[in-house]
Amino acid sequence: MATAAESGARTWPGSGSPRLGSPAGSPVLGISGRARPGSGPERTGRAIGSVAPGHSFRKVTLTKPTFCHLCSDFIWGLAGFLCDVCNFMSHEKCLKQVKTPCTSIAPSLVRVPVAHCFGSLGLYKRKFCVVCRKSLEVPAFRCEVCELHVHPDCVPFACSDCRQCHQDGQHDYDTYHHHWREGNLPSGARCEVCRKTCGSSDVLAGVRCEWCGVQAHSVCSTALTPECTFGRLRSMVLPPSCVRLLSRNFSKMHCFRIPETMVLELGDGDDGLDGSAAVGTGREVSAATESTKQTLKIFDGNDSMRKNQFRLVTVSRLARNEEVMEAALRAYYINEDPKDFQLQALPLTLLSGNAQALGKAGTTEEETSKDSGPGDSVPEAWVIRSLPRTQEILKIYPDWLKVGVAYVSIRVNSQSTARSVVQEVLPLFGRQVEDQERFQLIEVLMSSRQVQRTVLVDEEPLLDRLRDIRQTSVRQASQTRFYVAEARAVTPHVSLFVGGLPPGLSPQDYSNLLHEAMATKAAVVSVSHVYSLQGAVVLDVTCFAEAERLYMLARDTAVHGRPLTALVLPDVLHTKLPPDCCPLLVFVNPKSGGLKGRELLCSFRKLLNPHQVFELTNGGPLPGFHLFSQVPCFRVLVCGGDGTVGWVLAALEETRRHLACPEPSVAILPLGTGNDLGRVLRWGAGYSGEDPFSVLVSVDEADAVLMDRWTILLDAHEIDSTENNVVETEPPKIVQMNNYCGIGIDAELSLDFHQAREEEPGKFTSRFHNKGVYVRVGLQKISHSRSLHKEIRLQVEQQEVELPSIEGLIFINIPSWGSGADLWGSDSDSRFEKPRIDDGLLEVVGVTGVVHMGQVQGGLRSGIRIAQGSYFRVTLLKATPVQVDGEPWIQAPGHMIISATAPKVHMLRKAKQKPRKAGAIRDTRVDTLPAPEGNPL
């Protein structure tokens, strides 16, 4: 640990009497934001005493229109009150009502530390950073699980206050409180308490519960009941108390099956002014800000020196020592007395070297004691060091729920050990009668991206431990907690889903195959579930290290030329589910609907429990059905095109016997091009940016209906090979049909479109472009004549049916074809029954060519009604284009047998909108939840 500077060392000690509003006189420290020199309000006075949690307010002169962060109203006049630490701006009249804590003390107020899941950089319009409270005018990060937005250089200072979405054996509670997130509400948001506007698009104002969505002013939120009931979607949410995942060796990205992005580090920032700070990664300052000011590079301990990450602080050349120390501490949001720290100069020779040399420089004091004068060509560089302490006040938190007690404070000295601290605090928590040997002290590092727990040995000297933490990073010390916890033997258990294996093998064969590919350890790895048809297994792993090894190895392993898929799955405690709980299992195809699929994926993770939202490109629908296999009642939402819906329904049919709820109802959010099934079930022609919350409410209110599914057996004739006189036999093929099956011209058009999309997939990202390609392909076939009726034979219910002169034969199960066209028509006909999706009948329709198909699309004509039945046999006399639900191919000569699949599937049809009475108050969450925005770069 750095001690006082030796003779000849240049230091800025944090001595002297602190002025009012300084770190010593205020309960909080921090930086004043990302302001450029001269861009912020002009400071006109000394800091005033702060009654708000941790803020250090200063009266400033306003030079541009400014809004209050509490009431979100415009600040009239020239004077406002700005927190030097977090940029919180307030009216003078609002100061006494400020409840929002300052950024620098926010980590100490976190109830249960949970790390965030930051995705890729994106542009988020009219959003604000929760750390510095400034707008996100540059690419920024957002959490994939909660509504936290943050600048890249502010990420290290964000709290680990994400939603707790499962139990992990630590801090497990059955009762959940509101999880408040400040700001980024729409301008029309209304407070749940006073019914006045609480949102703003100009500043970070108002709060919203991440679970139930209730919105309120920060002042009014204290009037609400602390317990959260999950709001309007409570019956659809998978309760966190009913999900268990021991994720010791896995990141949050692994736990929620979110693709990992770049490792976040401090990025380049803006130059600071008057104690404000900006982040740098070895970036030099281009020019001096003012002749009367100097810019300093400030490092925080050995860790930032090793990574060559610093923050720039600009102060007056006439600044007192304590003022420079305060500015340096504010730059890193350090909420401690500046008299306990000093600044040590770093030599110019090390600054011009590489990051590795700079990291080594932080290990010895002799190397950092060289002089670095203000006249150097680069800004002066200093490192924050903690002065030696003979004793400290340490906060100890209970690892169990203790009503009315968040922590206790005790004094530790050089004689204090982890065991002595445990013995001292247990009586303070009311556990004095219990065996103290069963308790241990746990150190918890609460960074924004990872929460690390370390069990301290009984003989660990705590004062030395704190010294080592501060030597590494002073900011890290403020993000470190100590918990007293009962030592419990946790039995490791991790469920790993492994897909991409060869189908049709036995459990023993799969076990042997995995052992050959990944050298699994039989003592701790066993196959718990086998899905032979899909070529997938679920492994039970009773060793955390082995589970992590298998997970990382499987993602880089291929078996029989196919890459494996590995997912970490939690356990759903189905016996703990509330009686009225019917959770929604969500499948999203991010490739559908352009970027809308990706945005919906993020939105549903935030509205529901992210464990119940699955990305279909990462393992398909099988992992989701396995996770919900023991849930007695659940529903399904499929976000994608008709092909995606068919994919999920096929997986449901294959796994039905494994499910405790064998017939879940399925809703659709159409993202494809045609979306015929979505149209029939009233979900619309395609998703056009509706509020995701409103979509979930519609799913909850939807009506259950039955729908027929059909099995098509494709049995090709034997093919004679003229080269070697060998008879080749194409094996029979079985496909499932939900919407329609086309033979002839419509399948040929679909095949041409499919081939064009495979050649240039990047161009097929919008429905408008896709339909344009269909039109162009159709025009090319307008003079085509095939005489399909001469090339096929049709039997309906064992009876031969004579076909008229047609080019296409279509079997339809739903009254929508080709993006909403009514191919059967609405005219009544005594020969046929009125079609329904659950009548057990298929309608057979013919088309005479591309022109006829265009007329049907335009509503000018209908198709040629040929037959209606439940069993069909089609004989193909030559190779013919065939398509089923939009998937085309060339079918060899042979037979096609179409028959009903039992049982019928349960679908959800959107309820008709009821007319709203004039003046009726709408649901707050429905009105005010912002639509997803932000495009990944």
Curated annotation (Swiss-Prot):
Catalysed reactions, semicolon-separated: a 1,2-diacyl-sn-glycerol + ATP = a 1,2-diacyl-sn-glycero-3-phosphate + ADP + H(+); a 1-O-alkyl-sn-glycerol + ATP = a 1-O-alkyl-sn-glycero-3-phosphate + ADP + H(+); 1-O-alkyl-2-acyl-sn-glycerol + ATP = 1-O-alkyl-2-acyl-sn-glycero-3-phosphate + ADP + H(+); 1,2-di-(9Z-octadecenoyl)-sn-glycerol + ATP = 1,2-di-(9Z-octadecenoyl)-sn-glycero-3-phosphate + ADP + H(+)
GO cellular component: cytoplasm; cytoskeleton; cytosol; endosome; glutamatergic synapse; membrane; nuclear matrix; nuclear speck
Family annotation (SUPFAM superfamilies): Cysteine-rich domain, NAD kinase/diacylglycerol kinase-like, Ubiquitin-like
Ranges where the record places region Disordered: 1-48, 359-378, 911-937
PANTHER family: DIACYLGLYCEROL KINASE (PTHR11255), DIACYLGLYCEROL KINASE THETA (PTHR11255:SF54)
Positions of transmembrane segments: none
General function of this protein: Diacylglycerol kinase that converts diacylglycerol/DAG into phosphatidic acid/phosphatidate/PA and regulates the respective levels of these two bioactive lipids. Thereby, acts as a central switch between the signaling pathways activated by these second messengers with different cellular targets and opposite effects in numerous biological processes. Within the adrenocorticotropic hormone signaling pathway, produces phosphatidic acid which in turn activates NR5A1 and subsequent steroidogenic gene transcription.
Keyword annotations from UniProtKB, A to Z: ATP-binding, Cell membrane, Cytoplasm, Cytoskeleton, Kinase, Lipid metabolism, Membrane, Metal-binding, Nucleotide-binding, Nucleus, Phosphoprotein, Repeat, Synapse, Transferase, Zinc, Zinc-finger
Pathway(s) served: Lipid metabolism; glycerolipid metabolism
Gene this protein is translated from: Dgkq
Protein name stated in the entry: Diacylglycerol kinase theta
Subcellular location: Cytoplasm; Cytoplasm, Cytosol; Cell membrane; Synapse
Organism: Rattus norvegicus
First-tier enzyme category under EC: transferase
Domain Ras-associating: 390-489
Family: Belongs to the eukaryotic diacylglycerol kinase family.
